C-alpha cells in the first residue's frame, strides 16, 4: 500500500537517510514501497535529548532511520527505558513503555517512535514544560 505525504512549502523530511526539502509550493509525495520517512517535526537532534523520555525517543529514532545499524542504538534504548520505567508509577505510561519495547523487539521502529512521543507528552505535562 503506497504512503502518501502531503508536504508544506519548504518542508524538510528524511527519506532513507537523505534529507529532502520540498520546493516553494505544497507538494504530494507517493512512496510505492517500504522506506524510512520522518518529517522535520519528528526529527530530534542529539543535543535535544535532554530529558529521560527524549533519551528514549532519540535511539528509537536512530534505529528507525538506520535499521541496518539498529543494534548500535539498542543498548542505549534499553538502558534509558529501564531507568524511565523504574521511576514512573502511572500504569498507562508503563503499558506504553512495554508496548514500545515490544515494537522495538519486533523491529517495528516507526510504531515505537510514535508511541515514544506519548512519553515525551507525559513527561512535559508532569514537569510543566510547554511543547
UniProtKB/Swiss-Prot annotation:
The protein, known as: Probable flagellum biosynthesis repressor protein FlbT
Protein source organism: Caulobacter sp. (strain K31)
InterPro entries given in the database record: Flagellum_FlbT
GO terms (BP aspect): bacterial-type flagellum organization; mRNA catabolic process; negative regulation of bacterial-type flagellum assembly
Keywords: Bacterial flagellum biogenesis, Repressor, RNA-binding
Family affiliation: Belongs to the FlbT family.
Gene Ontology molecular function: mRNA 5'-UTR binding
General function of this protein: Has a post-transcriptional repressor function in flagellum biogenesis. Associates with the 5'-UTR of fljK mRNA and promotes its degradation.
Statement: the UniProt record of this protein carries the keyword Disulfide bond: no
Disulfide bonds listed in the record: none
Pfam families from the UniProt entry: FlbT
Amino acid at each position: 500500500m503506497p504512503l502518501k505525504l502531503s508536504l508544506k512549502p519548504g518542508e524538510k523530511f528524511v527519506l532513507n537517510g537523505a534529507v529532502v526539502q520540498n520546493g516553494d509550493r505544497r507538494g504530494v509525495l507517493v512512496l510505492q514501497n517500504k522506506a524510512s520517512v520522518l518529517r522535520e517535526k519528528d526529527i530530534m537532534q542529539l543535543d535535544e535529548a535532554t530529558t529521560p523520555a527524549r533519551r528514549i525517543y532519540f535511539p528509537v529514532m536512530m534505529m528507525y532511520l538506520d535499521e541496518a545499524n539498529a543494534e548500535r542504538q539498542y543498548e542505549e534504548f534499553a538502558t534509558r527505558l529501564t531507568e524511565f520505567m523504574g521511576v514512573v508509577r502511572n500504569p498507562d505510561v508503563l503499558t506504553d513503555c512495554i508496548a514500545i519495547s515490544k515494537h522495538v523487539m519486533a523491529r517495528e521502529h516507526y510504531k515505537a517512535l510514535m508511541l515514544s512521543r506519548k512519553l515525551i507528552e507525559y513527561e512535559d505535562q508532569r514537569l510543566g514544560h510547554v511543547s
